[in-house]
């Protein structure tokens, strides 16, 4: 096997561009998400299910923002650190844990928001257009729950609990066992970047989960468009069309987020696991590792840009924030 010190050689992209990007994302993400959380918790009186989902999404964003300085320092100095050093262990564990917990919590909440927005559309239609017993039960009881604040709070608690129970053991195993199996000396090493088979299997399961979340959003969006076309063929434009357009815009925003930020990462992950197994091709290995790290950074960038998305997703948040800015 090619020696780690000669095979794994980070380029200027890893040692300069990624640290600068992570620090920049940390600054704007911390400010924007802190402001958003302050608005959600203190300035919005009657909270809807959407507000609860978004507040938990902000919490996940703040979690990944706290990991960004660790990730930036890792790429800047990791090649020079000894693996057994305190800073290496700390950066590795906290960075990996925060990044993955935030990613999966965000995906689940985005999926729940998509279902909640679709439930908003079907609220009035369930009584007017549902004819079968199945339709009345599904639209009147199942989807209705996604719009209830208490249900939203309960689901968010379950989301955080399940994700933490799954991610923490995997991260501990990766940080304590896998990254030291081959006796690497540097913190930035082959085993740290690739992981052993258990971590790769967990990564593939996570990729499948990302695909499922994307499928939920796409299905909600497709159902909305189909319903809107059916309504417009038999009715004139009414006030409800404004609701349709609003929900359609919300689902489209979530869909674009998943496509731009998460889909490249999830598509590349299986390819990465297959191609890196070729022994001796150090140049290709370095390219693969840097591509993986760039796409991971892209996935985490969503957390820093979410406050802008909130302005598009929630009118109450937009009015409250504009009111605060006007007063100041």
Curated annotation (Swiss-Prot):
Give residue ranges on the Extracellular side: 1-11, 77-92, 178-197, 273-328
List the carbohydrate attachment sites. 3-4
The protein in question is named Probable G-protein coupled receptor 82
Keyword entries, A-Z: Cell membrane, G-protein coupled receptor, Glycoprotein, Membrane, Receptor, Transducer, Transmembrane, Transmembrane helix
From the UniProt record, give one GO term of the biological process aspect.
Answer: adipose tissue development
What is the annotated localization of this protein?
Answer: Cell membrane
Per the entry, what this protein does is:
Orphan receptor.
Q: What is the lineage of its organism?
A: Eukaryota, Metazoa, Chordata, Craniata, Vertebrata
Any one GO CC term of this protein is:
plasma membrane
SUPFAM superfamilies tied to this protein: Family A G protein-coupled receptor-like
């Amino acid at each position: 096997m090619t020696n780690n010190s000669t095979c794994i050689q980070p380029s200027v992209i890893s040692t300069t561009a990624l640290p600068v990007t992570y620090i920049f994302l940390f600054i704007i993400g911390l400010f924007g998400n802190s402001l958003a959380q302050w608005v959600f918790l203190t300035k919005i009186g009657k909270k809807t299910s959407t507000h609860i989902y978004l507040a938990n999404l902000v919490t996940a964003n703040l979690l990944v923002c706290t990991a960004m300085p660790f990730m930036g320092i890792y790429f800047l100095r990791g090649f020079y650190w000894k693996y057994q050093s305190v800073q290496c262990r700390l950066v590795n564990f906290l960075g990996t844990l925060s990044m993955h917990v935030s990613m999966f919590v965000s995906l689940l909440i985005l999926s729940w928001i998509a279902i909640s927005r679709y439930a908003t559309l079907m609220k009035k239609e369930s009584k007017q257009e549902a004819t079968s017993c199945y339709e009345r039960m599904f639209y009147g009881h199942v989807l209705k729950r996604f719009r209830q604040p208490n249900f939203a709070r309960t689901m968010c608690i379950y989301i955080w609990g399940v994700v933490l129970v799954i991610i923490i053991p995997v991260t501990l195993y990766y940080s304590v066992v896998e990254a030291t199996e081959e006796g690497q000396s540097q913190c930035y090493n082959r085993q740290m970047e690739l992981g052993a088979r258990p971590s790769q299997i967990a990564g593939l399961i996570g990729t499948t989960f990302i695909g499922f979340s994307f499928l939920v959003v796409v299905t909600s969006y497709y159902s909305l468009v189909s319903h809107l076309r059916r309504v417009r063929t038999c009715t004139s434009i009414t006030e409800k069309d404004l609701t349709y357009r609003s929900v359609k815009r919300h689902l489209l925003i979530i869909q674009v987020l998943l496509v731009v930020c998460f889909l490249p990462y999830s598509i590349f992950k299986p390819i990465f696991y297959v191609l890196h197994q070729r022994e001796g091709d150090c140049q290709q290995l370095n390219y693969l590792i840097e591509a993986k790290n760039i796409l991971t950074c892209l996935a985490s960038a969503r957390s820093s840009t979410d406050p802008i998305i909130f302005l598009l997703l929630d009118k109450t948040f937009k009015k409250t924030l504009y009111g605060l800015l006007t007063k100041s």
